[in-house]
Swiss-Prot record:
Keywords per UniProt: DNA-binding, Repressor, Transcription, Transcription regulation
Domain HTH tetR-type: 8-68
Gene: betI
Tagged with keyword Nuclease: no
Source species, domain of life: Bacteria
InterPro entries on file: BetI_C (IPR039538), Homeodomain-like_sf (IPR009057), HTH-type_TetR-like_transc_reg (IPR050109), HTH_TetR (IPR001647), Tet_transcr_reg_TetR-rel_C_sf (IPR036271), Tscrpt_rep_BetI (IPR017757)
GO MF assignments: DNA-binding transcription factor activity; transcription cis-regulatory region binding
Protein name as annotated: HTH-type transcriptional regulator BetI
Ranges annotated as DNA-binding: 31-50
Function in brief: Repressor involved in the biosynthesis of the osmoprotectant glycine betaine. It represses transcription of the choline transporter BetT and the genes of BetAB involved in the synthesis of glycine betaine.
GO biological process, one term: negative regulation of DNA-templated transcription
Length: 196
């Protein structure tokens, strides 16, 4: 009989090993055996906890989505109630170190690519997109008419994704500060245009 409390530890080991494997060789070349070996566990443990490689990728994506949600929540809690500050906090959470380190970026790129072919990952991606849009729209709605708020939210969501994607593909160190400044400029432009 397994020791009490071992399952969460093993699951975490396997998820972290999945991140490392994606970082080192990519998901296409990864096998359950490769990931299990990286975690120092048997392939049978992967099957026991996750079923197969897709189940493990699903769990890994849930983990990185959870980390994103926590980062955004942390920045928002520190930002105060002003809508502009809340919008900036959402931007900051998306460019948090947990989301822009090399491993996280490769995991996100793998997730986005796989979500085009795996319905469960596509569902997770849609939920993530909807959460971002909803959070942005709520804050813009506090200062802009609803149709304009929706448009501004869509634009900022696309800008966040675009800045992140371009930053991930250029190689080298991701310039989070530059990306933040560009996104902040978009927020300021939208809010100033509404004031005219």
């Amino acid at each position: 009989m397994p020791k009490k409390g071992v399952e969460p530890v093993r699951r975490e080991q396997l998820i972290r090993a999945t991140f490392q494997t994606i970082d080192e060789i990519g998901m296409a070349d990864a096998t359950v055996a490769t990931i299990a070996k990286k975690a120092g566990l048997s392939s049978g443990i992967v099957a026991h906890y996750f079923g197969d490689k897709d189940g493990l990728l699903n769990a890994a994506m849930r983990q990185i989505l959870r980390e994103l949600k926590e980062a955004v929540a942390r920045y928002r809690a520190d930002a105060g109630d002003d809508p502009r500050d809340q919008l900036r906090a959402i931007v900051d959470g998306n460019f948090d170190d947990s989301q822009i380190n090399g491993t996280a970026m490769r995991v996100w790129l793998t997730f986005w690519a796989a979500s085009m072919h795996q319905p469960e990952l596509a569902r997770l991606q849609r939920a993530n997109d909807q959460r971002l849009f909803s959070n942005l729209c709520h804050q813009f709605n506090r200062l802009l008419p609803h149709p304009q708020a929706r448009l501004a939210a869509r634009g900022l969501a696309a800008m966040i994704d675009g800045l992140w994607l371009r930053g991930s593909l250029v190689g080298g160190q991701f310039n989070a500060e530059k990306s933040r400044r560009i996104a902040y400029g978009y927020i300021d432009f939208q809010l100033q245009a509404a004031a005219l």
